[in-house]
Amino acid sequence: MAELSRDHLQGLTVAVTGASGNLGTALLRRLTAPGSPVAEVRGLARRRPPDVVPYDLVDWHLTDLGETASEHVLPGFLDGVDAVVHLAWALQPGRRPDMLHRVNVEGTRRVVRAAVAAGVPHVVHMSSLAVYAAGPRSQKVTEDWPTTGIPSSQYGRDKVDAERAVRDVLGRHPETTGTVVRPTLVLQPEAASEIGRYFLGPLLYGAARMLPGAFTHLLPLPLPGVAVGFVHADDVADALERMLDRRASGPFNLAAEPTMDADAIARTLGMVRVPTPAPLLRAALSAAYTAHLVPTEPGWLDIGLNAPALDSTRARMLLDWAPKHRGDEVLAEFVAALGRGESAPGPLLNPTGGL
């Protein structure tokens, strides 16, 4: 991997939405690190993080992008900015798809419109592998694969709609450089509590941590199988910094090797795989969701079963990007941190924080 020159980052003002979350925290670590050439970092969040690294050197602006009142905050947030990285995305409450759509899709539209109105030269939008249509398990897909998503997934539908909103706005403003980032599953140990609460809920998350034997030795995984990749949040942040430095445009897949099937996942975690028919797993998840035992709607399983693995050649070639962390190591470290209840001090990454 070529070293990042950072020549074009010198003196830039960079605005980051969703700056206190999983990816936002990783990006702030880079942009505010000693020796960073970035002149100013602005962060947008619903709640102000504590005044500790990496949040303490950020100029914070507070608003909820799902509310029209945010339209009065965004102009000041984006005034004089050289680039905005839009990371803000709500995963909960999963039982309120209307609320999620307002925050995620309409909020994205608000940010991009405000960026164009403020004359921001570069807009980077964080998307996801979930925008891709179902693909073959035997090959990785490039950025030209159809972006129609997995229809049964609320998350996937909103990601597709958010990308469409970005295209709709920037398509009328060719003077603005637009970048769309489509990573595979993004993990880091510091986000273990955040992700555990999002997908297991506080009750099952706490129970899973107290029952390590049951939690760590048997792993029901679907038949016929899965093909899943993982990438460390720090490696995604590295790619984002390279996009800012080079003002790279267009879509970029981000994934680390290896792509893992069900057996590889079980081996990595030291578990015993229990092959389970996919319809049975989905029915169990649907029942648990209906009974309010978990906050995870069944569409998440559909993404895991159907979303294709990603080819990151474009990022490697145009950005000289290569992840420093192997995907299997990222998964193993994350699950270990999940068992320890590991977190960071931000309002989203801290297990005592609200959603």
Go through each PLM region and give its residues.
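Active-site Tyr-X1-5-Lys
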Residues: 152-179
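Mid/C-terminal beta-alpha module of Rossmann-like enzyme folds, strongest
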Residues: 227, 235-298, 312, 328, ...
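Glycine-rich NAD(P)-binding loop of the Rossmann-fold in SDR/ketoreductase-type enzymes
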Residues: 99-110, 157-158, 231
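NAD(P)H-binding glycine-rich loop region in Rossmannoid oxidoreductase-like domains
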Residues: 63-106, 114, 134
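N-terminal Rossmann NAD(P)H-binding glycine-rich loop of SDR-like oxidoreductase domains
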Residues: 9-37
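N-terminal Rossmann-fold cofactor-binding loop
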Residues: 43-48
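NAD(P)-dependent short-chain dehydrogenase/reductase
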Residues: 172, 176-228
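Conserved Rossmann-fold NAD(P)-dependent oxidoreductase catalytic core, especially the SDR/UDP-sugar
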Residues: 106, 110-155
